[in-house]
């Protein structure tokens, strides 16, 4: 580890292999907290490269609990959190809606980082069991087209870094790792980042990790596609990255103020999500979901352009069938537990 630190102290970047080695030691609990603080701080001050981020992600994936990966195409929609704007749970709600649109979604999530209610906080309130086994999660993915993978269940080793992260009180490499370490390893992905300068490096990281199709976005202050302004996009396709801007008009949607998608406490966010899923969402809420699900439909080849994709999402929202899917997921997520108790 000290060899890696000396490289960083000289202002040089680590190789992917070196970073993989360093973070493998971290998640196995082999690194002294003071040394770990030095590692994270040195990386932060130098600026983490895509190779370093990819190496760290590979280390965490190598140490993760196994998930029985399916051989069909499936996706994830996830944000880094940390944008500080406390909006409604767009990515979690979008994951459910994407499944109702016929996609397969394995959503990797955790408790709140930035908003008052992270994806796991919301699922808890909806009665969806967070700590189901990998086999049961796979069953949900097969039968319902959606499963949620609770990060601490798959990445237990990350707990070794938690005291240092909390003591440092600043963003570190760990803040961008969550969306990159889905243990199911989705075949395509929409990932939101908390800062515009991360869009390109994170796209390069996903490409280095072998993602074939994906999109990294930052939406005018949000870690998701914005309905209140332009969204910076880095699109991954056929081994290349293309950068462009998207506006609500590109989806055939109106522009709304960011205040129109403000979230609240977990109970309040659950009520907002329930309304959206039941077809009672506000126009702004529906637009936010449509904008974030539409690219997934396009990546999956289920729509010809973003406007027709967004229109399809709005139709699915209006039908209320996503609420039925969420209820079935809540039931199925608990079946294994009741079976074992019997």
From Swiss-Prot:
Query: So where does Mg(2+) 2 get bound?
Result: 223-224
Q: According to the UniProt entry, what is the EC number of this protein?
A: 2.4.2.18
Positions of anthranilate 1 binding: 79, 110
Q: Where does Mg(2+) 1 bind?
A: 91, 224
Pathway it works in: Amino-acid biosynthesis; L-tryptophan biosynthesis; L-tryptophan from chorismate: step 2/5
* Domain of life assignment: Bacteria
Record Pfam families: Glycos_trans_3N (PF02885), Glycos_transf_3 (PF00591)
Species this chain originates from? Aeromonas hydrophila subsp. hydrophila (strain ATCC 7966 / DSM 30187 / BCRC 13018 / CCUG 14551 / JCM 1027 / KCTC 2358 / NCIMB 9240 / NCTC 8049)
GO MF entries: anthranilate phosphoribosyltransferase activity; magnesium ion binding
Q: Which cofactor does it need?
A: Mg(2+)
Task: Locate the coiled-coil region(s) and give their ranges.
Answer: none
Alphabetized, the UniProt keywords read: Amino-acid biosynthesis, Aromatic amino acid biosynthesis, Glycosyltransferase, Magnesium, Metal-binding, Transferase, Tryptophan biosynthesis
Known function = Catalyzes the transfer of the phosphoribosyl group of 5-phosphorylribose-1-pyrophosphate (PRPP) to anthranilate to yield N-(5'-phosphoribosyl)-anthranilate (PRA).
Q: Which reaction does it catalyse?
A: N-(5-phospho-beta-D-ribosyl)anthranilate + diphosphate = 5-phospho-alpha-D-ribose 1-diphosphate + anthranilate
Protein name (record): Anthranilate phosphoribosyltransferase
Gene3D superfamilies reported in the protein's UniProt record? Nucleoside phosphorylase/phosphoribosyltransferase catalytic domain, Transferase, Pyrimidine Nucleoside Phosphorylase, Chain C
Q: What does the entry list as the binding residues for anthranilate 2? A: 165
One GO-annotated biological process of the protein: L-tryptophan biosynthetic process
On whether Magnesium is a keyword of this UniProt record, the answer is: yes
As to how many cofactors bind and how, the note says: Binds 2 magnesium ions per monomer.
Output the Gene Ontology cellular-component terms.
Answer: cytosol
Q: Which family does it belong to?
A: Belongs to the anthranilate phosphoribosyltransferase family.
Q: Which residues bind 5-phospho-alpha-D-ribose 1-diphosphate?
A: 79, 82-83, 87, 89-92, 107-115, 119
Subunit structure of this entry? Homodimer.
């Amino acid at each position: 580890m000290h060899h890696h630190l000396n490289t960083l102290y000289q202002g040089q970047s680590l190789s992917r292999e070196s970073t993989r080695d360093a973070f493998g030691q971290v998640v196995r609990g082999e690194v002294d907290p003071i040394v770990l603080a030095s590692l994270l701080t040195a990386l932060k001050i130098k600026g983490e490269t895509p190779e370093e981020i990819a190496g760290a992600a590979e280390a965490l994936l190598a140490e993760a609990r196994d998930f029985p990966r399916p051989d069909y195409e499936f996706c994830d929609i996830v944000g880094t959190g940390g944008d500080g704007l406390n909006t409604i749970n767009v990515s979690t709600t979008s994951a459910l809606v994407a499944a109702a649109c016929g996609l397969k979604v394995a959503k990797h999530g955790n408790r709140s980082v930035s908003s008052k209610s992270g994806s796991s906080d919301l699922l808890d309130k909806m009665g969806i069991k967070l700590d189901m086994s990998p086999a049961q999660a796979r069953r949900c993915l097969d039968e319902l087209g959606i499963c949620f993978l609770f990060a601490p269940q798959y990445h237990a080793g990350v707990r070794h870094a938690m005291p240092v992260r909390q003591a440092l009180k600043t963003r570190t490499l760990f803040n961008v790792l969550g969306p990159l370490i889905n243990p199911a390893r989705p075949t395509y992905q929409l990932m939101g980042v908390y800062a515009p300068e991360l869009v390109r490096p994170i796209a390069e990281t996903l490409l280095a990790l072998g993602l074939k199709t994906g999109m990294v976005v930052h939406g005018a202050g949000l870690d998701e596609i914005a309905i209140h302004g332009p969204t910076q996009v880095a699109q991954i396709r056929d081994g290349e990255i293309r950068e462009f801007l998207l506006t609500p008009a590109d989806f055939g949607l109106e522009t709304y103020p960011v205040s129109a998608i403000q979230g609240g406490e977990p109970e309040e966010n659950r009520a907002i999500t329930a309304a959206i899923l039941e077809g009672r969402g506000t126009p702004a809420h529906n637009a936010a979901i449509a904008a974030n699900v539409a690219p997934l439909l396009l990546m999956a080849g289920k729509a010809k352009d973003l406007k027709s994709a967004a229109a399809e999402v709005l139709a699915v929202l209006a039908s209320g069938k996503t609420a039925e899917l969420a209820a079935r997921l809540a039931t199925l997520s608990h079946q294994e537990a009741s079976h074992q108790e019997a």
